[in-house]
Amino acid sequence: MAKELAAVYADVSALAMDLCLLSYADPATLDTKSLALTTGKFQSLHGTLLPLLRRQNAHECSGLSLELEHLLENVADALTTLGVCTSRKLSPEEHFSLLHLDITCNKHRSVRFNFYGNWALELKLSLINDVEIFFKRLSSVFYCIGSGSALEGLGEVLRFVGKLRGISPVPGPDLYVSNLPCLECLQEVCLTPNQGTSLQAMLPDTACSHICTPACGEPVRGLFENELKQLGLQTPESIPTTPCQSRVRQDDEIRQSSLMAVGDHHIFGEVTRSVLEISNLIYWSSGHSDATCDGDRDCSHLASLFTHEADMHKRRVDLAGCLGERGTPKHFFDCFRPDSLETLFCGGLFSSVEDTIESLQKDCSSAFYQQVNYTTALQKQNEFYVRLSKLLAAGQLNLGKCSTESCPSEARRQLVGGDKPEEVLRDAKHRQELYLQKVARDGFKKLSDCIRHQGHILSQTLGLRLWGSVIYNEASALQNHFLHRAQFISLPWQDLTVDCPTRFENSKYIKNSLYCQRLGREHVEILTLEFYKLITGPLSKRHTLFPSPPNVTLAQCFEAAGMLPHQKMMVSEMIWPSIEPKDWIEPNFNQFYSFENQDINHLQKRAWEYIRELVLSVSLYNRTWERELKILLTPQGSPGFKEPKPAGLTTGLYLTFETSAPLVLVDKKYGWIFKDLYALLYHHLQLSNHNDSQV
């Protein structure tokens, strides 16, 4: 079924991409007949597939099925809107305003979640990152909310995600931020060597590439110029050559001449001193070649880029005449063209955002390098090229001079000393020159690194990104967890949660038997890991070939949710080596997993106490009566869900995290719901004795 679903998703997403492009095209160029035919075919698919897909997602979902449901809804709405706009014969400005410039904003949502203990959360959503952060936090407290309330709230959150998804594979730049790490970023950081650095210090420097995945776009510069050449049209002049570019070409020519001079040398040949000198100069100058690109220049790279953009727009008139069209088409970017400042953030039609960032970097470096100190540093750095020119022009090298010469300064070749005033002044001046050179050289390197780093940040922020799979995968994992809980407790189990004197006496018998027992220290350590495993959220449970230990998985779950250190300390102190039954056994009868009105912090701690009691009491019960009762979680996608009496379920004690039916004892095809742990243990003892007697 997954293959068929993926095939449908591929076709629907391709249609969504085409429809997204058509919504920005000149309405006069649209084929209304083909559009109407496509709309009819899609409505047939929409009416057949969408109801079945919703039923499937209400039973068990995947990231692919959730996204496909949203695409079907959004494409249907977009086709209807585009059909209405084309039928009304609007002007291009009115057409695009109706499609894209609607003043109503639907990118904000408030969702209410009702937890146990009558504690409610009013969730404010604006970005995709808000949804992902909430998923991680809900995963860390999944045992504090009922499945019904969780599914109701998750439905609202998914509808909000569907609105953000739209039909474009490119999310809007106002829908996400890339400097907030997601759960996948945390997993990657945990696998990299940290050299003693904490996760809190490493995660802020992480640029998330999972929620919205960076895409390597096709180069735009030169693409349309090549199309004009193929049509036989004269292309506009390229970006004018500047003195900076002339110098760069000159430096490149020197480098190529140097490589030609040593090109005749091979591995079996003799290494002459001239070849060795040229090779060393080429090597040592290669690390600084990028810093010499932006010296003195007369015009801005950004100005040249904008000029080229304007020239290419003018050539569209010639292109329209060549194709026999009446005037140029009026697409969206013709009616609402961005100004120069907006182009810095969105790029142009004939240049990409990467081209804009590169030009901005060059202009910034030019402004810095025009300072006197950095100009001197550049000149000294270009001595490599000067020496290469002399070596190639002279024909014969002065080997002794070239191997020892490093600076023409006379002060570097004479010793400074003596007590005469002029010698002391000369020494001070020499030291001042060396200090200024060092400061200029270090500052030059720091400026280059800073410009490069800021350019990388701009590329990460403004670069092309596509919708990732993280949001839908996390949504499906949480949705399935609560769906399975709701489906499991809805099975025809026998309800034994009502107060009964017999079960009360049975509960007292088990408690009195456990009070005089004790767990070993080595046993407590194993049970602590089992406790950690039960309170680990569904998003942090990974089924891999090399699973992490339960304590590591729980730590990652809490770290992803942003839990504070004192809260983590409380978890670690729930079970200690010398713990005794009186420390965890609750005296109340039939009150297991019941919560009073309190906030989420007390709810969470109370849930930990219940789960601790379950783990330790069951273990002590097994040890005392030599039983093998296992603690299990609600199964995922069990084939027995549709049967009157479920088959194929493992015998054991199921923890559902539901206040109405927290404990379910399953034996073969039968099951019983309990609200008292020790009454359940007595019932299991009777069942096991009965089974042993039959054997």
Curated annotation (Swiss-Prot):
<dbReference type="GO" id="GO:0042025">
    <property type="term" value="C:host cell nucleus"/>
</dbReference>
<dbReference type="GO" id="GO:0005524">
    <property type="term" value="F:ATP binding"/>
</dbReference>
<keyword id="KW-0067">ATP-binding</keyword>
<dbReference type="InterPro" id="IPR000501">
    <property type="entry name" value="UL28/UL56"/>
</dbReference>
<feature type="zinc finger region" description="C3H1-type">
    <location>
        <begin position="182"/>
        <end position="210"/>
    </location>
</feature>
<comment type="similarity">
    <text>Belongs to the herpesviridae TRM1 protein family.</text>
</comment>
<comment type="subunit">
    <text>Associates with TRM2 and TRM3 to form the tripartite terminase complex. Interacts with portal protein.</text>
</comment>
<protein>
    <recommendedName>
        <fullName>Tripartite terminase subunit 1</fullName>
    </recommendedName>
</protein>
<keyword id="KW-1048">Host nucleus</keyword>
<dbReference type="GO" id="GO:0019073">
    <property type="term" value="P:viral DNA genome packaging"/>
</dbReference>
<keyword id="KW-0547">Nucleotide-binding</keyword>
<keyword id="KW-1188">Viral release from host cell</keyword>
<keyword id="KW-0862">Zinc</keyword>
<keyword id="KW-0426">Late protein</keyword>
<feature type="binding site">
    <location>
        <begin position="621"/>
        <end position="628"/>
    </location>
    <ligand>
        <name>ATP</name>
    </ligand>
</feature>
<keyword id="KW-0231">Viral genome packaging</keyword>
<keyword id="KW-0479">Metal-binding</keyword>
<comment type="function">
    <text>Component of the molecular motor that translocates viral genomic DNA in empty capsid during DNA packaging. Forms a tripartite terminase complex together with TRM2 and TRM3 in the host cytoplasm. Once the complex reaches the host nucleus, it interacts with the capsid portal vertex. This portal forms a ring in which genomic DNA is translocated into the capsid. TRM1 carries an endonuclease activity that plays an important role for the cleavage of concatemeric viral DNA into unit length genomes.</text>
</comment>
<keyword id="KW-0863">Zinc-finger</keyword>
<dbReference type="Pfam" id="PF01366">
    <property type="entry name" value="PRTP"/>
</dbReference>
<dbReference type="GO" id="GO:0008270">
    <property type="term" value="F:zinc ion binding"/>
</dbReference>
